[in-house]
């Protein structure tokens, strides 16, 4: 990190447009918020430290906004980088202003998943690194990342930010390289996985109430609550580094399913908001068949690693 800081500082001395912020590690949300506060540019985009961008990343975005001055958010494609292979992900087949249906689909996606033509569509809509945001859209609406949300900050941010405007432009070009790391923070044992999910749930409910969103959003939210238990099981309950015995783990899971919002979501979840695999997961969740749930979690991890897909 020291050498990286020196490189950034040297560039800042050469070009006064570059601002380097030195601060104690307070989490990615605080770092991003400070970056937004310091930003003097008309547009903001984000890059995660493990990833990289195409050489034409900035110039492509700059040229796109010059031709589409009334847009507030630009979306662009990306490349998933795995050991030994890459996968290019496209949102649609051509560039252009996104119509009302696309806007609706993208707005509701952070509450559950992206649906295109009535079917789940595998594309990272909830992240911030494949978008460019108008700075005034963020600052004028007090759009900040939630510091308590040490996981899934992007999703909360987009769940709210995408409600602020319907002026989205899509660029049919892969500009960003998302690097998949098996040992990344998103795959490590995390005793606070459930806490971070619950921070997100609080914010989803806040956003739905703030914008008076329809029942469709609530249904998507209920589906997200119950299916996010998968990540809790993957990162905590059934993770190999969890040293608690089976009975203790199962008792903890019982206590979780008995409390809000899980008990409420399990009663209200609409099957039409679930994929086939999620329906199976929720079925055994309602039955509290934890042995089968562990089998499903372990099997999905194996399958995802074989297919080279990002674990959710």
What is the role of each PLM region?
Residues 9-15, 64:
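Short, conserved SAM-binding/catalytic segment
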Residues 17-19:
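Short, conserved active-site loop motifs that form the nucleotide-linked donor/cofactor pocket
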Residues 23-39:
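Glycine-rich, basic loop-to-helix element that forms the pyrophosphate-binding segment
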Residues 44:
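Short aromatic/hydrophobic "clamp" motif used to bind/position activated sugar donors
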Residues 238-312:
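Membrane-interface aromatic/basic loop that binds lipid-linked glycans or pyrophosphate carriers
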Residues 1-7:
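Short, small-residue-biased leader/transition segments that mark boundaries at the very start
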Residues 173-181, 187-215, 228-262:
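Catalytic core of nucleotide-sugar-dependent glycosyltransferases
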């Amino acid at each position: 990190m020291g050498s990286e800081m020196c490189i950034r500082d040297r560039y800042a001395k050469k070009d006064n447009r570059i601002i380097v912020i030195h601060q104690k590690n307070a989490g990615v949300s605080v770092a991003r918020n400070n970056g937004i506060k310091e930003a003097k540019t008309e547009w903001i985009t984000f890059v995660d430290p493990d990833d990289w961008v195409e050489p034409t990343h900035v110039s492509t975005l700059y040229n796109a906004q010059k031709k589409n001055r009334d847009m507030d958010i630009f979306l662009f494609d990306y490349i998933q980088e795995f050991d030994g292979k890459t996968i290019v992900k496209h949102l649609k087949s051509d560039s252009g202003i996104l119509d009302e249906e696309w806007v609706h689909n993208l707005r509701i996606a952070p509450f559950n998943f992206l649906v295109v033509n009535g079917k789940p569509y595998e594309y990272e809509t909830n992240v911030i690194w494949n978008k460019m945001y108008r700075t005034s859209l963020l600052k004028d609406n007090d759009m900040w990342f939630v510091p308590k949300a040490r996981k899934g900050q992007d999703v909360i941010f987009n769940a709210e930010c995408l409600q602020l405007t319907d002026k989205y432009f899509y660029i049919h070009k892969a500009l960003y390289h998302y690097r998949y790391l098996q040992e990344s923070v998103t795959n490590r044992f995390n005793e606070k996985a459930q806490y971070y999910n619950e921070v997100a749930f609080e914010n989803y409910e806040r956003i739905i109430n703030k914008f008076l969103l329809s029942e469709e959003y609530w249904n998507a939210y209920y589906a997200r609550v119950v299916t996010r238990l998968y990540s809790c099981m993957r990162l905590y309950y059934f993770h190999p580094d969890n040293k608690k015995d089976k009975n203790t783990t199962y008792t903890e899971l019982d206590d979780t399913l008995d409390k809000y919002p899980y008990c409420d979501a399990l009663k209200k979840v609409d099957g039409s908001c679930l994929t086939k695999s999620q329906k199976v997961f929720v079925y055994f969740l309602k039955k509290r068949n934890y042995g089968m749930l562990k089998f499903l979690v372990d099997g999905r991890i194996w399958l995802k690693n074989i297919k080279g897909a990002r674990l959710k």
